[in-house]
């Protein structure tokens, strides 16, 4: 990273090459996905005695509801390592202050927050009209296996969220606020807006950049029925 940062100021340096910048960021993303999966599996197996691949997130497995609390924090760690850390690696490689590179120090007018809230609220009625109906959704002949895979992914996600929200205790509520709301919001903001949007903006027009980033953002959630609502929001 120091070597890359040291050459960033040159006319042909890394900072002046959006493609090199994109490759570094995506390499960090893929690398941290692997590191995250290996690390959380090791932590999980050490804490529970079995591999996380055998864990049923909905708690339906024998004696597995007792591990929901651990699973909650494992999810938070995975999100942080998968999105926030790659963003910081990219920002460090770009050179200069990584916090400034990720727009931590950018001043935003209070009116911009208000405008954003109004825009999102106004879009909700439209978003509801493009939500896929899971019950009536069919891909047609020849695509039954893909349809089955999509439904299984949706059911798994629903079961996981349901299990995480079942515990109504104060500690579980606070944990969910951190793991389900705060960590994803910050980590994904750093990766998609701090790294991806910033980098793609150097390759294409701003409007196209926003659409491409939104597409990738929604795709990486691997929830097909909510793909278009998430992308438009």
Region roles according to the model:
Residues 91-92, 132, 198, 202:
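Transmembrane helix-loop junction
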Residues 1-113, 117-122, 128:
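N-terminal, membrane-interfacial amphipathic/helix-forming hydrophobic leader that caps
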Residues 8, 67-70, 96-101, 161-167, ...:
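Short, functional N-terminal and low-complexity linear motifs
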Residues 61-64, 75-77, 105-108, 156-157, ...:
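Short amphipathic alpha-helical segments, especially helix-boundary/capping motifs
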Residues 123-126, 163-233:
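Transmembrane helix-loop-helix hairpins at the membrane interface
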Residues 2-21, 38-41, 129-155, 220-233:
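Alpha-helical transmembrane segments of multi-pass integral membrane proteins
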Residues 52-58, 100-183:
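Juxtamembrane helix-loop-helix connectors linking adjacent transmembrane helices
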């Amino acid at each position: 990273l120091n070597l890359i940062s040291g050459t960033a100021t040159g006319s042909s340096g890394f900072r002046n090459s959006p493609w090199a910048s994109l490759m570094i960021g995506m390499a960090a993303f893929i690398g941290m996905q692997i590191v995250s999966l290996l690390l959380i599996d090791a932590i999980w197996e050490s804490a529970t005695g079995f591999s996380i691949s055998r864990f049923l997130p909905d708690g339906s497995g024998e004696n597995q509801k007792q591990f929901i609390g651990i699973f909650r924090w494992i999810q938070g760690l995975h999100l942080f390592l998968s999105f926030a850390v790659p963003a910081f690696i990219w920002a460090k490689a770009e050179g200069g202050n990584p916090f400034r590179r990720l727009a931590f120090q950018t001043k935003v007018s209070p009116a911009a927050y208000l405008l954003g809230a109004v825009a999102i609220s106004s879009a909700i009625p439209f978003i509801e009209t493009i939500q896929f109906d899971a019950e009536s959704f069919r891909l047609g002949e020849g695509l039954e296996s893909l349809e089955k895979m999509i439904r299984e992914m949706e059911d798994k996600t629903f079961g996981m969220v349901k299990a995480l929200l079942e515990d109504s205790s104060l500690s579980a509520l606070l944990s969910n606020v951190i793991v389900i709301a705060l960590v994803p919001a910050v980590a994904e903001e750093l990766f998609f807006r701090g790294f991806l949007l910033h980098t793609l903006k150097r390759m294409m027009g701003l409007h196209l950049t926003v659409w491409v980033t939104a597409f990738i953002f929604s795709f990486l959630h691997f929830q097909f029925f909510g793909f278009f609502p998430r992308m438009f929001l």
